[in-house]
Amino acid sequence: PLYSSAASDVYKRQVLIGAAKYLAQTRNFDGTAVLIFQPAEEGRGGAKAMLEDGLFDTFPCDAIYALHNWPGLKPGTIGINPGPMMAAADRFEIQITGRGGHGAHPYQTIDPVTIAGQIITALQTIVSRNVNPLDSAVVSIGSMQAGHPGAMSVIPREAKLVGTVRTFRKSVQEMVETRMRELVTAIAGAFGGTAELIYERIYPATLNTPQHANLVADIATEMIGKENVVRDLVPSMGSEDFSFMLQSKPGAYFRLGQGGADSGCVLHNSHFDFNDAVIPLGSAMFCALAERGMPLAD
């Protein structure tokens, strides 16, 4: 069997290089350990591109593991969940078309801004009224564009909304998209306009295989003690392109605690400072996963 560990940022490369050095020197495993230095975690996902290029055809493996540092966990801790770790990420764009005109004569127009406002409000009812409260979903509008910033008395012809949907379950994801299409079409029509919803599924949910997640937790417990291992880490509504690899191979994605959240230096913050002291633990986890997954014959 082969084990693989994915990385995309500088610190994760350092973690993998440390693991590679130890595994090459000790050879305390029977098999091949594949270390994946994945580019382009952000954007449209380097993991998917690597899979499309035949990653697992060139480097077959039976299981795959990845880690990500986590400011919300104290240094020297490991966090994992035997099921969902991160949500699916969808992008949507709503193009609204009305009839432009003078702001002093709105009755002669079909105002796309008014339609946009109604759609924004209605979309928030999907989570509160259509999603089972025992499930999780997010519908967020990140951008609204209409008219010219300096045109105080011009009602534009068009407006555009851009946002994201986050879900864990595919059935919830499909229901949210269906309800969005129904609401967008009906609301625009009710005001005399039209609207087109462009819905794109970017990242699937990051779902750990219970067997492999439990192995991570067991190894971490032996290594750093059960008091430093969170086995039921609360899933994040953020997204991760390692999810594509977990769709192809069983495995697990876990968190490497690094601290710093209390000071506000969280991920994607310009003042973020990676805690170099946690690198050895990350390397040790990957080494132990390779050795435990591919033990030497007695």
Model-inferred region functions:
Residues 14-82, 132, 146-149:
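Acidic/histidine-rich catalytic neighborhood of metal-dependent amide-processing enzymes
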Residues 35, 50, 102, 116, ...:
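Divalent metal-coordination and catalytic microenvironments
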Residues 1-7, 11:
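Single conserved hydrophobic/aromatic residue that forms the stacking wall/gate
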Residues 226, 230-296:
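Zn-dependent metallopeptidase/amidohydrolase metal-coordination segment
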Residues 59-208, 235-237, 243:
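Midchain, well-structured core segments that form catalytic/ion-binding scaffolds
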Residues 8, 104-112, 274-282:
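Short alpha-helix boundary/capping segments
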Residues 12-23, 116-119, 123, 283-290:
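Buried hydrophobic packing segments
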Residues 206-219, 223:
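Short, low-order "capping/linker" segments at domain edges
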